[in-house]
């Protein structure tokens, strides 16, 4: 068997056809292709000389012999005809079309054993030719799937009795001899459109010498066909004849396009298969011709089976048609291309013929392209031909990502059918992403491709890459993957690969010109449009709602000149290299950077220049202030032009440089002035509204002592006379040199640092970089300024107290016990001076403001705080688990007296007391044993065990160190309060589920799981809302990378989205439930905490009394008693007395609570992900994966999971008594937490599938899931301390993460928010008052109402500035006058705030303004929330109204006693609305830390409504009590 091949010169393969347009004589030149080889030699010898001139004029086949018009050859039909498909990637004019052509001049033997190439030419000689046309007014070939147009009507006189049809792969298409001439004429007419067709030539095809191929390199063109034909005929003679069946059967050959790697020059690869024939049109005046794919390379038998690779770009689809040609006895085996006589008439007829099949094929290719994008890659050994890649201006080649695989469909010519349905073939190409297992039936391939692109864009937004999704929607793809990798060099390899897979998909879809609808948020109550990018090199322009680059890479050639004009004016004549595709990405975007002032958009230096005209590019001349938080910034543009508008602009570099520099100077000058104004403070806190901040000098890594001496460097601490070594401190700050200036300045912490208590004096050197018993929000362990403050403060403390202090023990002191009081020579225990009470653990100093914690012994009616203005003494604990920051009071004397060196001889005193050393050593050993079995084997307590740790025996009640709260008070509080206040609400509606006045205080659980100082800033619950948003996106990226790497392709979908709250058509009503079966979100909306109070009390009961019960959670309880406990919980809600209950009953009830949740604790969407992590991910990668999965959980689920895991870790700590290891606990609790093997409930999520009943052997899937759940829960219990920390990789995100902390501002910084240098905080407060009354005057226009179960009005308003937080407003009517309500808000917060722990006035600024600090409790073991606010009130407002305004402020005298909350805005407006009634309007926008934006959207508004209800109820309860008292 033979294949027709014609040799081409090297120049024809690598150059475009640049010939001039042909004259009218050229249009009458035709190409004649012989199709039978027997009499080929004579005809060639006859006509070779006669048709030389004609051959030179031929455009379609430049080197062919046109005189070889073979009409009457009785020879045998040729066995195989080679087919090649080509396309034109460079559209330089309006008259460019797509054509499929093939030449059949040269015959080269191919093995008959290859069944994939068995195509014979029948008597009817049916040949398929497809031609496309693209007119200037209408783009017919626009993209994959964009050609869904009506098919032209096929004229009967053109088709005659023969019609295009479809046959099976092995069917025989029989055409009678009588229709042969008609078919030939019709085909000839359809081929006369070549002057409208242009195709690019094959470029740089490697020459492969395969078996039985003839090397015809040196043969003259005139003798080429003659020599090839003679050799081919000689080789065909010994071929064994085929049997009748084989000769009468046509084997369908499918040429499939597969993804194969591109070369480093970005040229797509093409491999040509054998077995079909496409006739060459006679002439192609306006373009290049498509030659045979085998002209330059021969293929062996195994090579014939490998499908080819074709690059489709700019909407032009490579069409390769599978031709099933029936084989009969040879009769007249020729097809003749006749010369044109009436070209214009024939052209019109040919258009109809060609467009019919073209549209049919393109419609089918829409489906094939999608299939090709979701299948595996081709074999590595596939030989390929290189094709020229010439994208348009908006496209660029990308290494490994700029090829589109197109599946070839099967087309058969039939004489008895007119069907136009084209079956789709199986996809075999790889898109770079793992596909889903099953394809959706009924969806076209185009729609699938668009869905895949849409999912890729959604994934990019969900994982912190919204800038690339925007670029794709702006038609600025393809982009260079290498630059993206360089831009995100802080990511690990797996994350980069996951990102590149999506970008590769979008690159291919961009080449196919697939369009997706612009991104739209899901609903009006969604905050999806909140900008968040992992990379710090991109910034979001809020005014234009677009992303722009903050830094430009040096990837553009400075030598390239800029040519003004539209990108449509001209196109590059040569394909750009892979490195030059980001020019559109950065130049067409509004690039904003002070570093890119003189950068110009250009092609890469290694990209070949255009031959005709330089490529028009727009330089990056628009410098936009990228700080999105600068209010009223004059340096930012109000609106930016679109990329297309921007591309047509022309700029002058000199003018641009001058403008940008002036803007940069003004911006830097403003920032510097703001920094200098706050520099006189003890800490240089940069306002959160600023962008770039220049930090102070930082000691760089590698700066040795010799270098310091040469530079004359002197230790700052030495200048102050400090006696503590600082090299250790400097060593901690080395990593700070890798931080950017922005992050280093933003991470500077408060000067209100704490110091160890006197008991921990011996650990001063090793713990100089620690803080005792405190949560330091925003603490940066890499910051050097923190430790300098510690050093300076310690120096002041030592200087403030004499060295020869003598302490006196009371006369009635009993040896072996702690003294009741200690005094020294300068303090008298009976005077007004300070004293230490060892029994109560307090120190009383004279004349200091009080800051005391609400003890559990205080009854609810004894919540009266001492007024800070009238308190004469400060009660401060000196136990070593006290937050050292509490020791800083509002005046400086007490802080100086109570630092670590107040009692320097305390250790000696304790040592010399009779029997004290022995008892202390015994306590130390005993506590060490308890510490080994405590909840945290790797305890991160800020105060590790030491011989000096206090262990009290008071009133025969055993008080362990873990039962001491942060003030040292005993926390063995009674299980139930001595008096439970009676419910005073209405008893209907939402009041049934409203929390009582009692709120659980579980300080021992909080203190025992308090993180260490080094890990405080890494705790999730200390992160701001912007950091949480960024952390969630990074976690999704990390989880996607790990799952795609290790899990099978059918175990996860293409798209990973951040879990959202599921929207059901019918929302279940939980009004009749209070505990069991109530979602965690509803609990948060009702009480502010995700776990009901009664469930928390059950956990505390088990932890305090039942840890020694053998088989806890394993042994079953009594069902009747469990049911009674359930009913007790449903009725009492908050106060359930578990005293005397069986530990196993309570444990079983706790398991039932988690089992009865509407969805698993891990949520329906992520439960399977948790199981997959422990099924497929390697053990060393599981911790990263599980941390990422936890970050994707909703906030309430994550908080409950943390509480439960910490509680279970305490259970396993007592393993010697209860014999419950983490694995044993996991076996008992995993089915309840993951909802394994449970039937679908009525109110469960649609994802929960009904399990099959276990009739015999359990399902293998269930076994695998149970095993994974057990292993996973055991692992999470053991590693619970590490699961809820920020990944270390986030510290490598440079300023993109640290700059999102958004700390409160100082008073000076608040005054400068209005860009007035002379303004102070009073101007800021006045602006706040004016803004409040502006809202009132406008009647709160623009607020959106929000439904709530509380008896209050609730609405919200979106705020474009600052973090992604809404401004909430709740309104209620209160039975009190405005003055009383204002007093209740200012002085009586404990009457309505059930979570209040502490309150204190830090500083009084004027009669109506003060700095106020208060602490609120959180669900254990989560830390308390610390508020430091600047609050001011107004009483002289019109119509008797009052107002209270609060804003967080950074104050150096406010101790950090919890997670510092950032109150962005808090307003109370009280207006009289009747006799004895007032209308209370509460507006709030607060960052509580540790919550996602979704939590604030779904839950925070309900908390605001609940707050005003509690304020109203405080007056209602007071009135009711007053009436009860009068009635008695």
UniProtKB/Swiss-Prot annotation:
Where, per UniProt, does this protein localize? Answer: Cytoplasm; Cell junction, Focal adhesion; Membrane
Please report the stretch or stretches of sequence annotated as the Rho-GAP domain: 1078-1284
Question: What does the tissue specificity note say?
Answer: Highest level of expression in the spleen, with rather lower levels in prostate, testis, ovary, small intestine and colon, but none in the thymus.
Which PROSITE patterns does the record associate with it? RHOGAP (PS50238), START (PS50848)
Which biological process terms from the Gene Ontology are attached to this UniProt entry?
A: actin cytoskeleton organization; focal adhesion assembly; forebrain development; heart morphogenesis; hindbrain morphogenesis; intracellular signal transduction; negative regulation of cell migration; negative regulation of cell population proliferation
UniProt-annotated stretches for the region Disordered: 72-94, 288-310, 372-436, 558-617, 732-764, 829-876, 928-990
Bias kind Basic and acidic residues: ranges: 81-94, 851-862, 950-960
Q: Which Gene3D superfamilies match?
A: 1.10.287.2070, 3.30.530.20, Rho GTPase activation protein
Q: What spans are recorded as compositionally biased (Polar residues)?
A: 396-436, 936-948, 961-972
Q: Which key words are in the record?
A: Cell junction, Cytoplasm, GTPase activation, Membrane, Phosphoprotein, Tumor suppressor
Record-annotated site: Arginine finger: 1114
Residues with the Phosphoserine modification: 523, 526, 566, 757
For the region Polybasic cluster (PBR), what residue ranges are annotated?
A: 1051-1073
Name any one Pfam family assigned in the record: RhoGAP
Q: What does this protein do?
A: Functions as a GTPase-activating protein for the small GTPases RHOA, RHOB, RHOC and CDC42, terminating their downstream signaling. This induces morphological changes and detachment through cytoskeletal reorganization, playing a critical role in biological processes such as cell migration and proliferation. Also functions in vivo as an activator of the phospholipase PLCD1. Active DLC1 increases cell migration velocity but reduces directionality.
UniProt-recorded name of the protein: Rho GTPase-activating protein 7
Native organism is Homo sapiens (Human)
């Amino acid at each position: 068997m033979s294949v027709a091949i014609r040799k081409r010169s090297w120049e024809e393969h690598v150059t475009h056809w640049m010939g001039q347009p042909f004259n009218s004589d050229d249009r009458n030149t035709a190409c004649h292709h012989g199709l039978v080889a027997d009499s080929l030699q004579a005809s060639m010898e006859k006509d070779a000389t006669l048709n030389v001139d004609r051959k030179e004029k031929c455009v379609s086949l430049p080197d062919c012999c046109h005189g070889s018009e073979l009409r009457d050859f009785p020879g045998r039909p040729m066995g195989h005809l080679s087919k090649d498909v080509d396309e034109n990637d460079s559209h330089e004019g309006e008259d460019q079309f797509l054509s499929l052509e093939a030449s059949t001049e040269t015959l080269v033997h191919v093995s008959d054993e290859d069944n994939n190439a068995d195509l014979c030419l029948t008597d009817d000689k049916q040949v398929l030719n497809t031609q496309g046309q693209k007119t200037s007014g209408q783009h017919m070939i626009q993209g994959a799937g964009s050609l869904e147009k009506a098919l032209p009507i096929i004229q009967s006189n053109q088709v005659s009795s023969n019609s295009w049809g479809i046959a099976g792969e092995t069917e025989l298409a029989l055409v009678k001899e009588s229709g042969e001439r008609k078919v030939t004429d019709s085909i000839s007419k359809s081929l006369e459109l070549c002057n409208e067709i242009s195709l690019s030539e094959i470029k740089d095809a490697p020459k492969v010498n395969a078996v039985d191929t003839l090397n015809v390199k040196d043969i003259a063109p005139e003798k080429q066909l003659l020599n090839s034909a003679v050799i081919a005929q000689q080789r065909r003679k010994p071929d064994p004849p085929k049997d009748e069946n084989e000769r009468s059967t046509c084997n369908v050959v499918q040429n499939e396009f597969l993804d194969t790697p591109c070369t480093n020059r970005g040229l797509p690869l093409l491999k040509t298969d054998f077995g079909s024939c496409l006739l060459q049109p006679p002439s192609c005046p306006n373009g290049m011709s498509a030659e045979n794919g085998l002209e330059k390379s021969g293929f062996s038998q195994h090579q014939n089976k490998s499908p080819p690779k074709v690059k489709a770009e700019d909407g032009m689809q490579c069409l390769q048609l599978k031709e099933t040609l029936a084989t009969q006895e040879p009769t007249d085996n020729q097809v003749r291309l006749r010369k044109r006589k009436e070209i214009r008439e024939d052209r019109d007829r040919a258009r109809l013929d060609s467009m019919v099949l073209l549209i049919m094929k393109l419609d089918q290719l829409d489906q094939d392209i999608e299939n090709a994008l979701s299948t595996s890659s081709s074999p590595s050994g596939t030989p390929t031909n290189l094709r020229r890649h010439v994208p348009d201006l908006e496209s660029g080649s990308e290494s490994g990502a700029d090829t589109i695989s197109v599946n070839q469909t099967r087309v058969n010519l039939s004489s008895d059918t007119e069907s136009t349905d084209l079956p789709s073939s199986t996809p075999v190409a790889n898109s770079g992403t793992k596909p889903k297992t099953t394809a959706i039936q009924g969806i076209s391939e185009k729609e699938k491709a668009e869905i895949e692109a849409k999912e890729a864009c959604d994934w990019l937004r969900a994982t912190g890459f919204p800038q690339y999704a925007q670029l794709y929607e702006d038609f600025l793809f393809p982009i260079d993957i290498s630059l993206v990798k360089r831009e995100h060099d802080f990511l690990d390899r797996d994350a980069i690969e996951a990102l590149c897979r999506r970008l590769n998909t979008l690159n291919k879809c961009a080449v196919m010109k697939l369009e997706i609808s612009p991104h739209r948020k899901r609903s009006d109550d969604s905050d999806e449009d909140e900008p968040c990018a992992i990379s710090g090199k991109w910034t979001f322009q809020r005014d234009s709602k677009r992303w722009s680059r903050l830094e430009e890479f040096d990837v553009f050639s400075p030598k390239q000149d800029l040519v003004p004009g539209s990108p449509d004016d001209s196109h590059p004549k040569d394909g750009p290299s892979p490195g030059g595709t980001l020019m559109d990405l950065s130049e067409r975007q509004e690039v904003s950077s002070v570093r890119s002032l003189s950068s110009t958009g250009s092609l890469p230096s290694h990209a070949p220049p255009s031959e005709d005209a330089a490529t028009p590019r727009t330089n990056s001349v628009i410098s936009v202030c990228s700080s999105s938080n600068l209010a009223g910034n004059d340096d930012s543009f109000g609106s930016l032009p679109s990329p297309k508008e921007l591309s047509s602009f022309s700029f002058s570099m000199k003018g641009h440089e001058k403008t940008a520099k002036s803007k940069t100077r003004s911006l830097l000058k403003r920032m510097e002035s703001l920094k200098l104004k706050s520099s006189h403070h003890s800490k240089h806190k940069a306002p959160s509204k600023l962008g770039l901040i220049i930090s102070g000098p930082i000691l760089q890594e590698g700066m040795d002592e010799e270098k310091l001496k040469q530079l004359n460097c002197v230790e700052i601490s030495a200048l102050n006379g400090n006696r503590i070594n600082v090299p250790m401190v400097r060593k901690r700050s080395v990593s700070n040199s890798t931080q950017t200036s922005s992050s280093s300045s933003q991470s500077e912490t408060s000067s209100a640092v704490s110091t160890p208590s006197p008991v921990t004096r011996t650990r001063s050197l090793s713990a100089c970089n620690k803080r005792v018993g405190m949560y330091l929000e925003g603490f940066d362990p890499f910051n050097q300024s923190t430790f300098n403050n510690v050093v300076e403060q310690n120096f002041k403390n030592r200087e403030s107290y004499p060295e020869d202090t003598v302490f006196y023990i009371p006369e009635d002191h009993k040896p072996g016990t702690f003294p009741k009081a200690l005094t020294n020579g300068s303090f008298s225990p009976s005077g007004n001076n300070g004293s230490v009470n060892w029994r109560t653990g307090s120190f009383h100093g004279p004349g200091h403001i009080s800051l005391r914690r609400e003890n559990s012994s205080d009854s609810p009616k004894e919540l009266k705080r001492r007024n800070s203005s009238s308190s004469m003494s400060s009660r401060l604990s000196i136990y070593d688990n006290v937050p050292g920051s509490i020791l800083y009071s509002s005046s400086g004397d007490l802080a100086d007296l109570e630092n670590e060196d107040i009692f320097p001889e305390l250790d000696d005193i304790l040592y010399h007391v009779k029997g004290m050393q022995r008892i202390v050593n015994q306590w130390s050993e005993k506590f060490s044993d308890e510490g080994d079995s405590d909840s945290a084997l790797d305890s991160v307590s800020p105060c590790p065990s030491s011989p000096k740790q206090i262990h009290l025996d008071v009133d025969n009640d055993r008080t362990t160190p873990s039962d001491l709260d942060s003030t040292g008070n005993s926390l063995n509080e009674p299980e139930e309060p001595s008096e439970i206040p009676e419910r005073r609400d209405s008893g209907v509606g939402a009041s049934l589920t409203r929390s009582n006045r009692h709120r659980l205080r579980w300080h021992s659980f909080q203190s025992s799981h308090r993180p260490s100082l080094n890990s405080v800033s890494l705790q999730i619950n200390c992160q701001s809302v912007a950091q949480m948003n960024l952390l969630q996106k990074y976690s999704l990226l990390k989880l996607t990378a790990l799952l795609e790497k290790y899990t099978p392709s059918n175990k996860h979908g293409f798209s990973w989205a951040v879990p959202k709250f599921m929207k059901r058509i019918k929302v279940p009503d939980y009004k009749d439930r209070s505990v069991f079966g109530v979602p965690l979100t509803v609990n948060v909306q009702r009480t502010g905490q995700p776990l009901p109070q009664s469930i928390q009390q059950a956990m505390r009961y088990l932890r305090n009394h039942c840890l020694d019960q053998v088989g806890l959670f394993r042994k079953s309880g009594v069902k009747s008693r469990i049911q009674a406990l359930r009913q007790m919980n449903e009725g009492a809600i908050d106060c359930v007395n578990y005293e005397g209950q069986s530990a196993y009953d309570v444990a079983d009830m706790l398991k039932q609570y988690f089992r009865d949740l509407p969805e698993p604790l891990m949520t329906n969407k992520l439960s399977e992900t948790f199981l997959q992590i422990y099924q497929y991910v390697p053990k060393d990668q599981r911790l990263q994966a599980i941390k990422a999965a936890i970050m994707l959980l909703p906030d309430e689920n994550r908080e409950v999971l943390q509480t439960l895991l910490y509680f279970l870790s305490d259970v396993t700590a007592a393993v010697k008594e209860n014999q419950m290891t983490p694995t044993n606990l996991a076996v008992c609790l995993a089915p309840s937490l993951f909802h394994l093997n449970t039937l679908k409930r009525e109110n469960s999520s649609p994802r929960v599938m009904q399990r099959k009943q276990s009739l015999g052997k359990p399902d293998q899937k269930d076994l695998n899931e149970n095993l994974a759940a057990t292993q996973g829960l055991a692992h999470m219990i053991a590693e619970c301390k590490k699961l809820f920390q920020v990944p270390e990789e986030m510290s490598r995100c440079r300023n993109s993460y640290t700059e999102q902390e958004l700390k409160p501002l100082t008073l000076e910084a608040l005054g400068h928010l209005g860009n007035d240098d002379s303004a102070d905080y009073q101007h800021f407060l006045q602006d706040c008052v004016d803004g409040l009354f502006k809202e009132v005057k406008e009647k709160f226009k623009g607020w959106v109402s929000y439904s709530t179960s509380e008896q209050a009005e609730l609405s919200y308003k979106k705020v474009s500035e600052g973090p992604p937080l809404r401004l909430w407003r709740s309104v209620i009517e209160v039975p009190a006058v405005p003055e009383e309500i204002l007093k209740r808000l200012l002085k009586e917060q404990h009457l309505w705030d059930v979570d209040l722990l502490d309150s204190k006035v830090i500083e009084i600024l004027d009669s109506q303004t003060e700095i106020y600090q208060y602490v609120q409790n959180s669900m254990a073991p989560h830390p308390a929330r610390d508020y430091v606010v600047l609050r001011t009130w107004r009483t002289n407002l019109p119509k008797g109204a009052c107002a209270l305004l609060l804003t967080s402020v950074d104050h150096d005298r406010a101790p950090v006693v919890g997670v510092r909350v950032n109150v962005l805005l808090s307003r109370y407006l009280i207006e009289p609305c009747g006799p004895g009634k007032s209308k209370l309007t509460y507006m709030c926008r607060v960052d509580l830390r540790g919550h996602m934006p979704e939590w604030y959207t779904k839950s925070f508004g309900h908390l605001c409504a609940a707050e005003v209800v509690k304020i109203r109820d405080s007056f209602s309860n007071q009135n009711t009590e007053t009436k009860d008292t009068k009635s008695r």
